[in-house]
Each structure stands twice: as C-alpha cells, then as structure tokens.
C-alpha cells in the first residue's frame, strides 16, 4: 500500500469514453458504516464477479484492509464561546426570511436546508500576524450543529478595489488537505520561510480579487468534527451553507462576481460544489465561473496518460525505463475495465478495487523512483508530500499566537489528514465520474481547466484529453480548436510566452509551461496573469 500513499495526499492523483450520463444519486453502501470485521463478512457474501475483484485485491495487497481505517478520529478541540466572535449568523434566521416574488407569491429569500448551520466570524488583525497589513481579513467557522461539523475559513479582501473586485473561493485537494497550503505555499498573500518568517507575495491572487480559503472537508486543517465526511457530494452541502451565510453577513461581497477555483482533487469537488450552488434558484451566491487546476476529474480518460507522461512523451525526459513503461501498458486494459465498471455502478464495492489497482499499477512505478509526483523535474525533498516548505507552514500555524489570532479551536494543525484521504478512497469517491457534471456547468457559466505541464499526478496530457472527449454541445468545435500561444500582455514581461490555450464557447483549456502540480508555486507571474485575465472575462462564450 505504501506504493501509492503519497499520491493520495496532496494530489490524486486516450480511452474510449462511453456515453456520459448525469452523476447518479449517491449509492447507499450501508456496509461502509459497519466495523471492519462486518465489512469483510460483507465481501464474502458478494456476487462472484465482485468477490473475485476483492479477492484479487487482497491477494495483491494483503495489508490493505488491515492498514486502512474507514473513519477519522475526531481532532482534539475546545470550542470558543459565542462572545469570542464579532458576528454569529444563525442559519435558522436566514432560512426564516421570506420575500415577495415577481409573481406576487412569497418565497424564501435563499433556498437550502440551513436551519442547523451557524457562521462565526471574527476580524483578523493583520498586524499580529504580519500578513498583508492594511488588507481587511476575517476568519471563523461554519458550524453544522446537527452533525457536529465545524469548517474553518480565512478571508482576505482584494488589495486593489474590494468594493468592485470579484470574490473567489479557493480549494486545495487531497482529498484531506488544508487550503491554507494554497494560501502560504502557492497563491495567498504570504509565504513562510525556513526561519518561520512571513514573506510578502507580490503575485498573490488577492491582488485583484477577494479570496476565501476553506479547510474542507471536516477534520482537515483547522476544521474539526465528531463525525466524518467521505464523499464529495456530502461536502458540497456544507460549502453551499458556508457561502450563503457568509454573503448574508457581508452583503457588500455578495454583489460582486463569485468564482470557485481549486486544484487536484478539486477536480472532483468543484463540479459537485458548483452544481449544488446552481441547483438553488433563490440564492445569494453570484457564481460566474469555475477554475480547476491540475485536477482529477475523469479518471477513465486521464489514467491512460500516466504512462506517456512518465515515459518521456509529455515534454520532459522519461522518468521510467522501458520495462516499467511496458508494465504500465500491460496493466492499463484491466485498469480501464475496472474504472468503466465503477462508472456504471458508482458503488464503493466496484470503485474501491479500481482505485487501488489502478493507483498501484499506473502511479506506483513512478513513485518507486523517488521522483516528485508533483513535478517530473525534481526528486522528493521530504516525506510523502515532497516539499520541505510545507513543514514550515505547519510549524508557523501551530504557534499559539497564530492560532489565537485566527480563533482556531483545534489543538494542532496538520497540512493533510490521511484518515480523510482513506475515507474518500474506501467509499469509492476517487474513481467516480464527476466530469459528467461539467456539461451542465458549461451551459450556464465559463469553465477553465488549466494544467502545469511538469506535473505527473494530474498531468496536462490527461487533462487535455478529457476536455476534448467530454460530451457537450460544443465538443467537436472544442476538440478541433487550435492550441494558441498564451503570452503576458500587460507588465514588464509583456510578450513572454507562458503556455498554450484553446477555447470554444464556455469551455477553455490551458497548458502552463514550467508549472508543476501547483502552478502558482512554480510560475507565480504566469498564474496571476491568466487568473486576472480569466476573471476579466477574456475567455467565455
């Protein structure tokens, strides 16, 4: 199992694509709520084909079921009294607001089941942390009181024109990794150096947008719960509630355009979260677009591109030898067959074996080389996450003055929670076809898929492939569209070629040169360039 552990943390990691259908209603796999012993009993009682898959899995990876737990242990925490916070927004109060419709009939001001949610808000004093002095900041928790879930967020106003600039929600992936990683390691207003000093980031995405960094799902980062979330659809309900209550507290931001951006496993999150928002007719969330960077969205189409990327066909020298490349080729047909079965059933009993087999067969050979799965140009620096700098962030966030300034309620901060990662994996969420939600988004708003071209785990070859095979009304035109040079247009680097872009209607794909899994880390100037231009509406129908 250790052959693919790292890939399941920060990242995620041309097939014939069957006719795409909307993502099915969540499958009820009740056995997953049982103790592990009962789960094994359930496997024994399954049908022959499914049992064979699990038997083969157990034979190939004998420690798998013993090593993995299905639920995350609650994080130690102490909830602060309401008096600690500047504002507490009650979901029940928001749900109780009725307004007159255009037809003269009364309806709720905002839709959704909100009565069990609260939002706690406090102003963050930038002078105490040394981050973006003069920029208004808020932090706090979204509380799901019925299910004992508490999601932490940190909001930064735009450095430029917060009264008019758009608002962006940023999501890191994993699943199970804190979005504060994105804040301090990629696109936020500051980074942390080896001496735990705060370093200003001139290329922060809040240069021309206000940004919310959210630790989700629960038990990630500063978030905590007595329960657990183990699939993307369930997490989407929490995000809708957070945004609804946040914009109710701050109506000045609700007037601005709103966008959702993220990377890696956010390729699952964002189609589901955006679809959840759009499903509510009466809402105060002015969603205008979504951006997915180096995401895992359509595994069936993306997994065949691990071998080319590892074997020198993605624009960089080969990492693997010919023997390993042939081994991946040989394993691919079975991997694809298992993913196809997962797409058909969306059951954990089918999707979990597909995840474990394919990750070991298609990602494992690369990982065993010690090369960075997030950047084919480098070796892993430190531990499973490959970047020593992540340790500095964790150390800084675990300082008591920092936690006090933010109102954090957990005893300690971790950049990634492996239990959450395993929960999603062992509930079958990893391989599910969330790309089937994307056509519905394209009909209503612009969708950007961008990819740093040095990433292995969610590489640009696979992302380009799934965008070109996606079933939607403009598929043929998008697939045949030319990849054009993407150059910087409005600063001292004007004319610099930073990548390639193709677009048709509301759908756009970008390849960013020299970027790894985390494009803003490797190419900060280029990332801010395309981000600002995207928010400005340069690529849309």
Curated annotation (Swiss-Prot):
<keyword id="KW-0732">Signal</keyword>
<feature type="active site">
    <location>
        <position position="264"/>
    </location>
</feature>
<dbReference type="InterPro" id="IPR001563">
    <property type="entry name" value="Peptidase_S10"/>
</dbReference>
<protein>
    <recommendedName>
        <fullName>Carboxypeptidase Y homolog A</fullName>
        <ecNumber>3.4.16.5</ecNumber>
    </recommendedName>
</protein>
<comment type="function">
    <text>Vacuolar carboxypeptidase involved in degradation of small peptides. Digests preferentially peptides containing an aliphatic or hydrophobic residue in P1' position, as well as methionine, leucine or phenylalanine in P1 position of ester substrate.</text>
</comment>
<dbReference type="GO" id="GO:0000324">
    <property type="term" value="C:fungal-type vacuole"/>
</dbReference>
<dbReference type="InterPro" id="IPR029058">
    <property type="entry name" value="AB_hydrolase_fold"/>
</dbReference>
<feature type="disulfide bond">
    <location>
        <begin position="380"/>
        <end position="386"/>
    </location>
</feature>
<feature type="disulfide bond">
    <location>
        <begin position="177"/>
        <end position="416"/>
    </location>
</feature>
<feature type="disulfide bond">
    <location>
        <begin position="311"/>
        <end position="325"/>
    </location>
</feature>
<dbReference type="GO" id="GO:0004185">
    <property type="term" value="F:serine-type carboxypeptidase activity"/>
</dbReference>
<dbReference type="InterPro" id="IPR018202">
    <property type="entry name" value="Ser_caboxypep_ser_AS"/>
</dbReference>
<keyword id="KW-0926">Vacuole</keyword>
<feature type="active site">
    <location>
        <position position="517"/>
    </location>
</feature>
<feature type="glycosylation site" description="N-linked (GlcNAc...) asparagine">
    <location>
        <position position="506"/>
    </location>
</feature>
<dbReference type="Pfam" id="PF05388">
    <property type="entry name" value="Carbpep_Y_N"/>
</dbReference>
<keyword id="KW-0378">Hydrolase</keyword>
<feature type="glycosylation site" description="N-linked (GlcNAc...) asparagine">
    <location>
        <position position="485"/>
    </location>
</feature>
<feature type="disulfide bond">
    <location>
        <begin position="335"/>
        <end position="358"/>
    </location>
</feature>
<feature type="disulfide bond">
    <location>
        <begin position="342"/>
        <end position="351"/>
    </location>
</feature>
<feature type="active site">
    <location>
        <position position="455"/>
    </location>
</feature>
<dbReference type="Pfam" id="PF00450">
    <property type="entry name" value="Peptidase_S10"/>
</dbReference>
<keyword id="KW-0325">Glycoprotein</keyword>
<keyword id="KW-0645">Protease</keyword>
<feature type="glycosylation site" description="N-linked (GlcNAc...) asparagine">
    <location>
        <position position="491"/>
    </location>
</feature>
<feature type="glycosylation site" description="N-linked (GlcNAc...) asparagine">
    <location>
        <position position="208"/>
    </location>
</feature>
<dbReference type="InterPro" id="IPR008442">
    <property type="entry name" value="Propeptide_carboxypepY"/>
</dbReference>
<feature type="propeptide">
    <location>
        <begin position="18"/>
        <end position="122"/>
    </location>
</feature>
<keyword id="KW-0121">Carboxypeptidase</keyword>
<keyword id="KW-0865">Zymogen</keyword>
<dbReference type="GO" id="GO:0006508">
    <property type="term" value="P:proteolysis"/>
</dbReference>
<feature type="signal peptide">
    <location>
        <begin position="1"/>
        <end position="17"/>
    </location>
</feature>
<keyword id="KW-1015">Disulfide bond</keyword>
<comment type="similarity">
    <text>Belongs to the peptidase S10 family.</text>
</comment>
């Amino acid at each position: 199992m250790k052959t693919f552990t790292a890939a399941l943390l920060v990242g995620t990691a041309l097939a014939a694509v069957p006719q795409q259908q909307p993502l099915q209603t969540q499958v009820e796999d009740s056995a997953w709520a049982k103790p592990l012993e009962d789960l094994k009993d359930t496997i024994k009682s399954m049908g022959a084909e499914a049992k064979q898959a699990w038997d083969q899995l157990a034979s190939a990876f004998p420690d798998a079921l013993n090593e993995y737990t299905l639920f995350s242990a609650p994080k130690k925490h102490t909830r602060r009294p309401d008096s600690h916070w500047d504002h507490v927004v009650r979901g029940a109060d928001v749900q109780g607001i009725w307004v007159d419709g255009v037809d003269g009939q009364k309806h709720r001001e905002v839709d959704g089941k909100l009565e069990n949610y609260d939002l706690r808000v406090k102003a963050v004093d930038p002078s105490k942390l040394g981050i973006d002095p003069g920029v208004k900041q808020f932090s706090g928790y979204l509380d799901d009181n019925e299910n004992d879930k508490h999601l932490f967020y940190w909001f930064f106003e735009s450095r430029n024109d917060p009264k008019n600039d758009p608002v962006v929600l940023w999501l890191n992936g994993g699943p199970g990794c804190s979005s504060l990683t994105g804040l301090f390691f990629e696109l936020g207003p500051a980074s942390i150096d080896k001496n735990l000093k705060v370093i200003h980031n001139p290329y922060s995405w809040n240069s021309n947008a206000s940004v919310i960094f959210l630790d989700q799902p629960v038990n990630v980062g500063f978030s905590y719960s007595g329960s657990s979330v183990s699939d993307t659809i369930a997490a989407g309900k929490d995000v809708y509630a957070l945004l609804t209550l946040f914009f109710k507290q701050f109506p000045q931001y609700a007037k601005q355009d709103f966008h959702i951006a993220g990377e890696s496993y956010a390729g699952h999150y964002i189609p589901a979260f955006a679809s959840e928002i759009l499903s509510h007719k009466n809402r105060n969330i002015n969603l205008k677009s979504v951006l997915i960077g180096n995401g895992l969205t359509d595994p069936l189409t993306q997994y065949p591109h691990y071998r080319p990327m590892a074997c020198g066909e993605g624009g960089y020298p080969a990492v693997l030898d010919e023997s390993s490349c042939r081994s991946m080729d040989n394993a691919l047909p079975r991997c694809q067959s298992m993913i196809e079965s997962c797409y058909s059933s969306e059951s954990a009993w089918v999707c979990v074996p597909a995840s474990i087999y394919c990750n070991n067969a298609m990602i494992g050979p690369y990982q065993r080389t010690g090369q960075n799965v997030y950047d084919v140009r480098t070796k892993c620096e430190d531990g499973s996450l490959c970047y020593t700098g992540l340790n500095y962030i964790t150390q800084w966030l675990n300082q008591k003055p920092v936690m006090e300034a933010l109102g954090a309620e957990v005893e300690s901060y971790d950049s990634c929670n492996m239990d959450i990662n395993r929960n999603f994996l062992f509930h079958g969420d990893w391989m599910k076809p969330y790309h089937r939600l994307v056509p519905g988004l394209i009909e209503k708003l612009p969708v950007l898929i961008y990819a740093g071209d040095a990433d292995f785990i969610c590489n640009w070859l696979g992302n380009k492939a799934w965008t070109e095979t996606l079933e939607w009304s403009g598929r043929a035109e998008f697939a045949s569209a030319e990849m054009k040079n993407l150059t910087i247009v409005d600063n001292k680097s004007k004319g610099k070629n930073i990548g390639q872009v193709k677009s048709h209607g509301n759908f756009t794909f970008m390849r960013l040169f020299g970027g790894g899994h985390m494009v803003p880390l490797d190419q900060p100037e280029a990332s801010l360039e395309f981000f600002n231009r995207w928010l400005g509406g340069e690529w849309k129908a």
